């Protein structure tokens, strides 16, 4: 064969392969509905060094969430021995009191999945009792007192997170698999359901919606100042942004894709990666904690891996990737103060579990 013929043949082959790859990638993206966008990196990346904050108490076993308002900080202990919530003075973190007593009496909690601190009022979620409880600060501000309990509608399947939308409404993920979110009034009654799980797994949509909903478990946060509700998946790498002021919805999928799972006895068993573990919507951005560890690696290490994520991913209020922070600790929960350029985080691996990062 003449050299020109060989060159022509190679050119045609490369052109065909390029066209095939283009069609394949384009087809992959077209499988998703409109409003689904993909990202593979961040325009900025920085390393952050954590400063350990020493506590004057050793109460915390698994500090899962932290929220701060004014001169008060609350840390939620997912596996608390006696109480699930602990109140501290901020920024010194002197221990003040505990709340959310563990037990099965009417005034005690079987579990605490999350809590919200807003306008000097605390709301807690007990999934096992299917209850939301409001607590107010005492006159001294050094303790929290139960004010009311809201029993959730039976149509709301095992709520694992919640956000406060306004004085009359909560938003809770829908674990039936039929929709994405439930809107619930202050009496615990279901108002309606909105959205759908943005998956291309047609088989799961047809035959295993509850398992699909389990795999798509997401953590929520809502900012009433800008009307942005963000949901991030515990498995895979999916960020959903709902603008509740103009009813727009944007979905961003990272390089690890949507949650991967297999169905076993009606339950969704994870097979991909651990994704996000916390999210906070500030006035200007969306901050998330990302793990990115595969379940194969977790099983292979047999508990030797640190628990948590060592990345903080920052997105715009439209879900565009802005910055990736690489941490020197593995963390679970965060609280971000953009005014002071400070991130307070929880580390479940250490006896001193509260960290401070400066990103200014």
Labelled PLM ranges:
Residues 288-307, 353-357:
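Short, conserved, GDST-rich strand-edge loop motifs in beta-rich repeat architectures
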Residues 137-168, 172-173:
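Asp-box/WD-like beta-propeller blade repeats and closely related beta-sheet repeat scaffolds
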Residues 22-24:
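C-terminal motif of bacterial Sec signal peptides marking the signal peptidase cleavage site
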Residues 63-67, 113-117, 160-166, 210-226, ...:
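Structural signature of eukaryotic scaffold interfaces centered on beta-propeller domains
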Residues 34-61, 320:
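A short helix->beta-strand "capping" segment at the edge of beta-propeller domains
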């Amino acid at each position: 064969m003449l050299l020109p013929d060989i060159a022509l043949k190679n050119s045609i082959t490369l052109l065909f392969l390029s066209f095939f790859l283009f069609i394949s990638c384009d087809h992959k993206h077209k499988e998703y509905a409109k409003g689904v966008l993909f990202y593979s990196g961040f325009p900025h990346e920085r390393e952050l060094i954590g400063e350990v904050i020493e506590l004057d108490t050793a109460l915390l076993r698994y500090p899962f969430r932290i929220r701060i308002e004014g001169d008060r900080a609350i840390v939620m202990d997912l596996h608390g021995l006696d109480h699930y919530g602990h109140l501290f003075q901020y920024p010194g973190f002197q221990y003040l009191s505990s709340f959310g007593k563990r037990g099965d009496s009417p005034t005690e909690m079987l579990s605490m999945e999350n809590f919200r601190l807003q306008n000097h009022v605390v709301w807690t979620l007990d999934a096992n009792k299917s209850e939301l409880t409001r607590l107010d600060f005492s006159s001294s501000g050094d303790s929290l007192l139960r004010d009311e309990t809201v029993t959730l509608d039976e149509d709301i399947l095992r709520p694992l997170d919640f956000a406060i939308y306004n004085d009359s409404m909560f938003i809770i993920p829908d674990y039936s698999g039929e929709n994405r979110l439930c809107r619930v009034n202050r009496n615990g009654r279901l108002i309606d359901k909105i959205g759908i799980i943005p998956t291309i797994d047609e088989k799961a949509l047809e035959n295993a919606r509850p398992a699909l909903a389990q795999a798509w478990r997401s953590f929520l946060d809502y900012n009433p100042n800008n009307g942005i509700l963000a949901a991030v998946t515990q498995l895979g790498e999916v960020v959903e942004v709902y603008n509740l002021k103009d009813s727009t919805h944007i979905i961003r999928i990272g390089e690890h894709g949507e949650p991967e799972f297999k169905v076993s006895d009606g339950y969704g068993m994870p097979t991909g990666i651990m994704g996000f573990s916390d999210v906070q919507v500030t006035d200007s951005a969306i901050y998330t904690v990302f793990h990115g560890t595969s379940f194969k690696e977790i099983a292979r290490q047999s508990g030797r891996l640190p628990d948590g994520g060592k990345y903080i991913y920052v997105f715009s209020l439209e879900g565009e990737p802005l910055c990736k922070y690489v941490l020197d600790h593995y963390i679970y929960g965060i609280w971000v103060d953009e005014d002071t350029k400070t991130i307070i985080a929880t580390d479940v691996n250490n006896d001193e579990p509260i960290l401070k990062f400066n990103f200014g």
